[in-house]
Amino acid sequence: MKAIFLDKDGTLVDDIPYNVEPRRISLCPGAGSGLRLLARLDYHFFVVSNQSGIAHGRFAEADLKAVGNRLADLLFREQIELEGFYYCPHHPDGSVARYALDCFCRKPLPGMLLNAAQEHDIDLHASWMVGDILHDVEAGNRAGCRTLLIDNGNETEWRLGPRRIPTRIAPDLYTGAVLIASEEGARR
C-alpha cells in the first residue's frame, strides 16, 4: 500500500493554533480536489500531527477524538477515506508532566510514520509526506518517503540540512497533488 501522510494544521486544514473546536476546522482551499486526484492513483490517507497543546495544557488529549471525527467527516464529504489519525501529544518543554518528554513520535522524528507503516503495511518508499514546515519534510525523509513542502508562509525556521530538503515544493495541496501525480506518471 502507498500512502499520503498529511500534516494537519496549515496543510490539510486551516491553521488555527491549538484549535480543538470541530466547527472551526475547515479544509484548506483545494485540499479536497487534490486528495481526490491522489485517491485515483490508489494512495491511502493518514494524518500525522504534532499536538503539543496537550503537553502545554492548552487542551486535553481526549479532545482530539472530536478533531479526528471532524477530519474524517470533512474528507468523507470529499469522497476521501481517512485511514488513520496519528498525533504526538509530547513536547520536551511541556507543563503537563505526563507529556513533557522527548519522544520518537514528535516530528521531525519519524515515529508516527513508522507506526502507521507497520500497522497498515505501507510501502514508505512509494509514499509521500506532505507538510507546511521543514520538520514535516525531515520526518518524511527520515522514514524513507518522498516529501512535499507546502510553502504557504508557515515555515519560520529555515534551518536547512540534508534531511530537510523536500522532493517537491508547492504553494498549496492541490498544486502539490498535481506534482505528485506527474511524478507518479513519470515513474510508470
Language-model segments: residues:
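Acidic, Mg2+-coordinating phosphoryl-transfer loop and its flanking beta/alpha structural elements
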Residues: 125-168
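Short secondary-structure boundary segments
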Residues: 50-51, 151-154, 173
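Conserved Lys-Pro-Asp/Glu-containing loop-to-beta segment of HAD-superfamily phosphomonoesterases
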Residues: 104-137
